[in-house]
Regions:
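An exposed, glycine/acidic-rich loop-and-rim segment of catalytic or binding clefts
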Residues: 1-314
Length: 314
């Protein structure tokens, strides 16, 4: 196990950005940067023993600063949308930036994924990022300190087979001196055939869930929890593995309201994992576990028109 730190370029204001690469005993690695506490690459072996980078990202800090897709970052203070950029807490109405049409998204245009975090090497296989957000920043109350730690392990015990596997553990911590909303996540885009391999429509996906949260036309939750055995929910059903792209062109109100798949699935409490994805091309299997009650399925619906310069110019 080892952690390597190297320069990752500079931001427009001249601040230097660093890249941290953790390599495990299986020769597989993950790279993370202090800009946005972002995952920039995940290198794992395919069925033929070749390394593939399965995380979308950019080559340097300048390209990350220009992109608006939250590639690999930690959005905050609140991931996802807040209607009309307003919320009420303890009788006070707070007004936030509306950076997604009429709504607030991922903490606004200065969200945590667009901030330079303080980094430290926590161990031989983990890196920790810490960020301070003062009271009133972007309209939110409370002085907040958040930490995110990435730990990269290797084990010979698999979930579904006896193959060796790498394990990425993401740990979050937030502290505030006042009540405030805080909802952190990681926004990595995965392609198990490789970041430069195009569509994930052929990936097989299973989600351990019987219900999902309904969206309105602005991709905001309506408050209705839809069961997957309802007739109009068939296209949303991943209880049995199916290709992600099998139904995504169907004329269905749920897909229209999300501009594709961009929905929260309510996870079964007794499940040992939340979701698994696999692609026959590479043979790479990804399993997701969580302590949280929901999982967001997002199929990169807005990437095509985002003008992002990805790794290697992709």
């Amino acid at each position: 196990m080892s952690v390597e730190k190297k320069p990752f370029g500079t931001l427009s204001d001249g601040r230097e950005v660093s890249l941290y690469t953790i390599t495990n005993e299986g020769g597989e690695s993950i790279s993370v940067t202090d800009y946005g506490a972002s995952v920039t690459s995940i290198l794992v072996h395919d069925r033929d023993g070749n390394l593939r980078d399965i995380a979308l990202g950019c080559d340097n800090a300048a390209d990350y600063e220009c992109q608006t897709a939250c590639l690999g970052g930690v959005p905050g203070r609140v991931a996802n949308r807040i209607e009309k950029g307003e919320f009420t807490l303890d009788g006070t109405v707070y007004h936030l930036e509306c950076n997604d049409g009429p709504n607030h998204l991922h903490g606004g245009s200065h969200g945590f994924h667009r901030r330079l975090w303080q980094a430290s090497i926590a161990s031989e296989n983990s890196v920790r990022f810490t960020l301070f957000s003062p009271n009133g920043e972007d309209g939110y109350p409370g002085n907040v300190v958040v930490s995110v730690q990435y730990t990269w392990n290797f084990t010979k015990k698999g979930y579904f087979n006896d193959r060796d596997k790498s394990v990425l553990d993401i740990w979050y911590k937030g502290m505030s001196d006042r009540d405030t909303p805080l909802n952190l996540t990681n926004h990595t885009y995965f392609n198990l055939n490789g970041h430069d391999s195009g569509s994930v429509g052929g990936h097989l996906l299973k989600i351990v869930s019987d219900e999902f949260t309904e969206n309105d036309a602005n991709c905001l939750p309506t408050g209705r929890i839809v069961r997957l055995d309802e007739p109009e929910a068939k296209v949303m059903d991943f209880r049995t593995s199916k290709e992600i792209g099998r139904d995504w062109n169907e004329k269905n109100i749920h897909l229209q309201n999300g501009s594709g798949y961009d929905h929260n699935y309510v996870l079964l409490e007794e499940a040992t994992y939340a979701a698994k994805a696999w692609t026959p091309e590479s043979g790479i299997l990804m399993v997701c576990t969580t302590e949280q009650p929901g999982l967001q399925l997002y199929a990169g619906n807005f990437l095509e028109n985002s003008n992002i310069r990805g790794k290697g110019g992709v």
